Amino acid sequence: ALRKVDRNRFVLDNVTPQPREAKRYKEEEEFPGHGRRRRRRSKGKGKAKGKGKGKGKRRRRRKGKGKGKGKKKGKGRRRRCRRGRGCKKRKGKKGKGRRRRRGKKGK
């Protein structure tokens, strides 16, 4: 439960403080036939550094037909396949889009 300590400071009193993980990087190890040696273990690298994103990975919103045509970007870096949205072999296959009801006149 939270216990109020200060005007705006609370403390968990039902949580026992966990013992900190011992320093990992110097520990003795027995090597059979070689006696004991102290070996440095790395403290771990933390998070892996992400792979850098190339220009093509940055997502751009696909500019729709309506609502003002923004500046279309250049072709950029061409990938192997230039399958567009309307391609049958595509993973996210083409949607129907917004079907416009034109009424009777403009059939």
UniProtKB/Swiss-Prot annotation:
Compositional bias of kind Basic and acidic residues: 1-10, 20-33
Propeptide boundaries: 1-35
Tissue spec: Gonads.
Disulphide-bridged cysteine pairs: none
Region ranges (Disordered): 1-107
GO molecular function: DNA binding
Keyword Cell inner membrane found: no
Protein name: Sperm protamine P1
Organism this protein belongs to: Bolinus brandaris
